[in-house]
Every structure is written in C-alpha cells, then in structure tokens.
Amino acid sequence: MRRILSVLLENESGALSRVVGLFSQRAFNIESLTVAPTDDPTLSRMTIEAVGDAQALEQIEKQLHKLVDVFKVVNLSEQEHIEREIVLAKVRAVGSSRDEIKRLADIFRGQIVDVTPKSYTIQLSGTNDKVDAFISALKEETTLLEIVRSGLISVSRGEKNIL
C-alpha cells in the first residue's frame, strides 16, 4: 500500500531525524521525502511517501502524532490531493537526436534549461507516472547522463489545508 503523509513539525535541528527514525526503527523504506520551511519560519512541512503493509504504516502514522516536534500529521492518501515531482534530466544530445529530444521535451511539457554542444538538461514537473514515462521515453531516444528527482510534494484539494 502507498501512503502519502504531510507532516507539520518544528523547524529545528533533530526534528527530521526523529521522524525518519520512526521509519528506520520499523525497517520501513521511505520512497520519497521532501522538507522545507513554511511561511512561518518556526515550522517545516514534510511530505513522506512510503510503500508497505497498511497496518504497519498506520502504526507509524499514530507514532508520528506522539512526537514532541510534530504539530500535525495528515494522510493525504485518504483524500483528494494534488501531487507533483520535479526532475532534471541531463542527456546526450548530438546530431539528429537533438531535434527528437526537443520534441520529447515539448510533448511532456518540459523545458530545456541548459544546452551544451553535446548535451541538454531538461526540467519537467508532473506526477510520478508522468516523470517515469518521460524518463523511459528519453532512454529509448538517447543516453541519460544524469537524473535528479526532487521527491514528491503534495497538498489536499479544495479548501482544506494542514495549518
């Protein structure tokens, strides 16, 4: 089972470590983790994507609520939400493949953000599935030199918010 948790926690050293520690104590792998300060500089928002046994993930979620540094935990998987990820893909771009790579970037609504005589760096944002499909399409067309993915960010749809 896949679960996306949005966690509001104190923006101080050690808070991230305690949250991640709950997952590692139970031998759970975090698929994706993003953290950044909110508009309130004393708080950070963390988005955690984890895959595993539903009961174990539920237990971890309950334990998160008990951590002193954590103000709020929302399971976005159980409600309408929007999720995005950013990828930077550096690819070999020589000869006739340059035009095809540009076409792929356009089809997926990516932007070429760096150009050299032998490579392009393309930025793309979208769902995990869109990012995966883009990377697969690039692999069929050219050589991937480097890939960097941001990790998942997510927010509930509509009027709801975590604050």
UniProtKB/Swiss-Prot annotation:
What UniProt keywords apply to this chain's record, in alphabetical order? Amino-acid biosynthesis, Branched-chain amino acid biosynthesis, Transferase
Pfam families membership: ACT_AHAS_ss (PF22629), ALS_ss_C (PF10369)
Q: Which GO terms describe its molecular function?
A: acetolactate synthase activity; acetolactate synthase regulator activity
Q: Which residues cross the membrane?
A: none
PROSITE patterns in alphabetical order: ACT
- Domain ACT, first and last residues per copy: 4-79
Q: Which reaction does it catalyse?
A: 2 pyruvate + H(+) = (2S)-2-acetolactate + CO2
Q: Which terms in the GO cellular component ontology are assigned?
A: cytosol
- Matching InterPro entries, A to Z? Acetalactate_synth_ssu, Acetolactate_synth/TF_NikR_C, Acetolactate_synth_ssu_C, ACT-like_dom_sf, ACT_dom, AHAS_ACT, AHAS_small-like_ACT
- Report the EC number(s), separated by commas if there are several: 2.2.1.6
Involved pathway(s): Amino-acid biosynthesis; L-isoleucine biosynthesis; L-isoleucine from 2-oxobutanoate: step 1/4; Amino-acid biosynthesis; L-valine biosynthesis; L-valine from pyruvate: step 1/4
Amino-acid biosynthesis listed as a keyword: yes
Q: Give the superkingdom in one word.
A: Bacteria
Q: Which GO terms describe its biological process?
A: isoleucine biosynthetic process; L-valine biosynthetic process
Q: Which family does it belong to?
A: Belongs to the acetolactate synthase small subunit family.
Q: Which PANTHER family does the record cross-reference, listed alphabetically?
A: ACETOLACTATE SYNTHASE SMALL SUBUNIT, ACETOLACTATE SYNTHASE SMALL SUBUNIT 1, CHLOROPLASTIC
Binding partners and assembly: Dimer of large and small chains.
**What is the protein's name according to its record?**
Acetolactate synthase small subunit
Q: Which organism is it from?
A: Haemophilus influenzae (strain ATCC 51907 / DSM 11121 / KW20 / Rd)
